[in-house]
Amino acid sequence: MNATEKDLPQLEESFIEEAERIISQYPVSKRSASLPLLHLWQRHFGFVSPQGVQWIAEKLDLEPIAVEEIATFYPMIRQRPLGHYQFKVCRTLSCALAGSYEIFEYIKKSCKTVNEVGHHVYVSEDGKFSVEFVECLAACGNAPVMMLNEEEWMDVTQTKIDAILNHLIREKRKEEF
Amino acid sequence: MAKAEYRLILKHADEPGYTVDIDCYLSHGGYQVLKKALAMPPDQIIQEVKISGLRGRGGAGFPTGVKWGFINHEKNTKPVYLLCNADESEPGTFKDRQIIYKDPHQLIEGMVISAYANRAHLAYIYIRGEFAKGAEILEKALAEARERNFLGKNILGSGYELEIYVFRGAGAYICGEETGLIESLEGKRAYPRIKPPYFPAVLGLYMCPTIVNNVETLCHVKHIVEMGGAEYARIGTPNNTGTRIWCVSGDVNKPGYYEYPCGAITFGELLYEVCGGIRNGNKLKAVIPGGSSAKVLRADKKYKIPKKKEDGSTEIVEMGLEDIPLDFDTVAATGSMSGSGGIIVMDHTRDMVECLRNIAEFYAHESCGQCTPCREGSLWMKKMLDRICTGGGRPEDSKLLLEVANHIAGRTICAFGEACSWPVQSFVEMFGEEFEAKQRKESSLEILEPLTNRTA
């Protein structure tokens, strides 16, 4: 990783302020802010790039490897972009009993997510959609459960998926006009 | 008629019109118990919690008062930290979610009281990353509490100072293990720490005495201070005090969360009356009683339960699964555990080998990779189950599965070793005939619905 200052994306003032606010919550050790800053970076840029790791490391006076090892440990932190709309379907027992594998296949088919980019992770050709299996989302009483980006969806059915996709496509068209 | 719920923790959670706003909480008597607590000496609160018999609701069921008692405040010179474990990562469990999403101030009040009792001035809520909305709700609730002086420098004029922050995890099950949680909060990989020391109360966050309690546990503290430890102990049965929130999922007609005093309801009453019976009129086959790490219980088996008689002696009673009361000790006597209260139900159409394969995949994915038996064993078991389920099973596989599982439990730094081997041990022991039939590739099992329609 040879990221230099000029490779860094232009960071807005508000981003840096938010980073400072987060760091202030860990008065004993700045290092504790590593994961929160990775979350912040990912929320802004969609994934954590080597530049992101570098920036966070500098901010926290750490070696980049100390941030990198966190970024690669936690499943939610991504090192590459995924779809604009990310479906995360729960795979674990209660959801599987309620048909989450069928839901997963249905989303895959409906969104034409044909490229397998990782274990249980699929992205559509145009990069708009991605579908992945995740482990227990702690809403087992409403299985099957999924997340669409950071939003939680309960009691998912194929009809619900159709409605969600129709809505997303309409929204997308509006944006294009 | 199903037995009525006794809602202590979830009293207001589902009331129409009840919101997460602080004004709503205050109009329901919120933060009154905090006022009472701040007028008590901290040791008296610890004493009340001890008297209450409160046991941790995260899974292990360890007495909270005893945990708190590990810190010697007379000798201790280091700062004390309080951590709320809101990772809720045990599959089958969704109770803490109800508290966080619907009644966050109850948790905050419980936390301020607990932090005051333990002389902590800094506390964190470690919330699972997937609860993005929950983290937002908590952040807002904490800001409101700060504004009203329930948090900050001089809480309600008592001179007591406390700050609470939210820390979001990022999808790792192992962060529910308290020392893994601490490592994660320190900005490291969530590798659980070597024991001893057995309790973070000795060495925890930043190598300082730390108390780690589950969300529900901290809420119970509020009610204990409100009603007094002795009064609280009258709810439930001896050594199994208070209420518990049972989360039911799987093959029942009405899955959901139900709060009852410990021991007040049996598996049969819960599944057939409260949850409306098994789906499609099917027969009950198996129950995982306390989150996916708990050993599976077979519905048609008799369990030997020690029962205290009136003269104080103990007799062994044979009980069917449906007659077993839901508490800590009776469920433990079956050889399993009530763990986090996550009850997963499977009916007679379910293929138990497929169910175990699903659980094994979870543990193979979630092993943190620190200890060899767990890292290698969890994946090995998953691969064996994959091949059994896809027609490549070998006659010796169930024996080998047991052998691998037996070599993990007790040989790892944290309890994940047990968590990943108990399901394998219990499924193979309880449903051996299904594994053997599948290994022999007998077709008699084709009537069972496949859990997945994938090809591995």
PLM regions and their residue ranges:
Chain A
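Signature of N-terminal electron-transfer/Fe-S-associated modules in redox systems
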Residues: 1-177
